[in-house]
Regions:
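N-terminal juxtadomain amphipathic helix
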Residues: 1-83
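Positively charged, low-complexity intrinsically disordered leader regions
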Residues: 62-137
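Short glycine/serine/threonine-rich phosphate/pyrophosphate-binding segments
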Residues: 123-128, 140-160, 175-177, 223, ...
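A short, small-residue-rich loop immediately preceding and capping a beta-strand
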Residues: 129, 133-156, 162-170, 241-254, ...
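Active-site-proximal loop->helix
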Residues: 150-194, 198-205, 290-293, 412-420
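Active-site/ligand-binding loops adjacent to catalytic centers
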Residues: 194-211, 264-373, 418-459
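Active-site/ligand-binding-proximal alpha/beta "capping" segment
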Residues: 205-269, 361-367
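Claisen-condensing/thiolase-fold acyl-transfer catalytic domains that form or cleave C-C bonds
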Residues: 357-413
Length: 459
């Protein structure tokens, strides 16, 4: 049993067979990790080992940007791993936007996950999650989603034909770009009266009662796949870690998986330097920011303060606070991976910040002008970087990697409202959320249907 599941609570620490299916630890209710007996596995002596697979095209799994790192997530045989070509993403040096963030040239990099098959980072995790589903013989799978998870699950089920997908979404809480993907790929779509947090609660209940294989990031195998985003970042930087990884924070699956990646790489002696981690909430969905920076909730060696969390949620419910942000992918008030994220922040000496809708949209416009258009949630990473540089937390010459989680076609309304000239549309999409200026907008220009007028304009 070289791969198994382990409860993250050190006071429990119970282990479970690889082929058992649990949403959380049956004994104490804590989250589960996928763990390995590394001393019994053929671990590479150096990360340079993976360079041998850069040009591999004949073996689909080695072409995958997830499974070519199979030795670092070896819970399934390579030939059993599910892939639809995910992980062909790039780390782009971003001198064009570094001044906006307050960084010197050569310091800022953008990890663009919008090149994945469904257009977001979720495909990294879905490749691993559906692989475990295949191992346990799942035929029906489900998720709750703000949009990207549903699109990813739907495309994997549609392409592989292994499982039927059911997705739960909140009423009016999903961008049409993402919803269209799930519908087009054939997923059964259940729209409930509520938001993502409500949908997440209902999908867990339905999964238990109907034996649906749950593929939210509560599933520890999802997070195994998302570790590979960090492997590709290191690969692009010639295996030298950056000073900072900055990532948007929603359900906290990415930040949790990044932390696990660095914990394991360090334990295996494959890296010495551990990057610092910054997780960026939207101000309208800032549970992690409030708990970490204000309430001072910490990992504390795995002995996190349950009472602080429960008290926070009780007060949130009493006040009727609901997540609300244009960055729909991170519009979440009850992040299921909260405790794993605390572990990542602890190991990576991390910080948490919140950014406003205005800061997100301005950052998004600055990313877009360089050709790497992103959805609003992605831009939270750049907005957070700008804030941390202004605070002096990030040095102007430190090497920073911002994770762009999804492409701009995921939520075109925000883009059109920001850059367009329709004041009524702007107000309905952005103005009501506190966005007042469009300093970096690329407004379309209206001109008469006359070639001379067009020529004069272009001159």
């Amino acid at each position: 049993m070289t791969a198994f599941q382990r409860c993250i609570n050190p006071d429990c620490g119970h282990t479970f067979d690889l082929l058992e299916v649990h949403h959380s630890c049956p004994d104490c209710g804590s989250l589960l990790d996928v763990d390995y007996e590394w001393d019994k596995l053929p671990v590479p002596k150096s990360l340079n080992f993976f360079e041998d697979f850069w040009g591999c095209r004949r073996i689909p799994q080695r072409f995958s940007g997830v499974w070519r790192f199979h030795e670092l997530l070896p819970f399934a045989k390579l030939e059993d791993c599910v892939t639809i070509g995910e992980g062909q993403t790039i780390l782009q040096k971003a001198d064009f936007v570094a001044p906006y963030a307050g960084l010197k040239a050569g310091s800022l990099f953008l990890q663009y996950e919008g090149l994945n098959p469904s257009g977001s980072f979720k495909d990294n995790g879905m490749a691993a999650g559906t692989t475990h589903g295949k191992l346990v013989g799942a035929r029906h799978t489900a998720c709750a989603s703000t949009g990207n998870t549903s699109a990813s699950l739907a495309i994997y089920c549609g392409v592989t034909r292994m499982m039927n997908a059911v997705i739960f979404i909140g009423s009016g809480k999903i961008a049409y770009g993402k919803l269209s993907q799930a519908l087009d790929y054939g997923a059964k779509t259940i729209q409930i009266e509520g938001d993502f947090d409500d949908a997440m609660a209902r999908v867990q209940e339905a999964s238990k009662r109907l034996n649906l294989y749950l593929l939210n990031s509560l599933n520890p195998f999802r997070l195994e796949g998302q570790k590979t985003i960090m492997f590709r970042v290191l690969e692009a930087l010639r295996w030298e870690g950056p000073d900072w990884i900055v990532v948007p924070g929603g359900n906290l699956g990415n930040s949790s998986s990044f932390g696990k990646a660095f914990i394991e790489l360090h334990k295996l002696g494959l890296i010495k330097k551990v990057p610092r981690l910054a997780v960026i909430n939207a101000a309208g969905a800032d549970t992690l920011y409030r708990l970490y920076e204000q309430v001072k909730l910490r990992w504390n060696g795995g002995h996190w303060d349950h009472d602080k969390i429960q008290k926070f949620y009780d007060q949130m419910d009493a006040e009727g606070r609901r997540a609300s942000t244009i960055a729909s992918a991170i519009e979440i008030n009850r992040p299921v991976n909260l405790t794993k994220c605390l572990r990542a922040l602890d190991f990576c000496n991390g910080v948490v910040r919140e950014v406003t809708e205005q800061e997100i949209l301005d950052a998004k416009a600055n990313v877009g002008v360089g050709g790497l258009g992103c959805e609003p949630a992605s831009a939270a990473s750049l907005a957070g970087t700008k804030k941390l540089v202004a605070e002096g937390v990030i040095g102007k010459d430190e090497r920073v990697v911002c994770i762009l989680t999804g492409n701009q076609l995921k939520d075109p309304n925000a883009t059109v409202a920001y850059h367009g000239n329709n004041k009524e549309f702007f107000e309905s999409v952005l103005g009501k959320r506190g966005v007042t200026t469009t300093e970096f907008a690329n407004h379309p220009i209206t001109v008469a249907n006359d070639i001379e007028a067009i020529i004069r304009l272009l001159k």
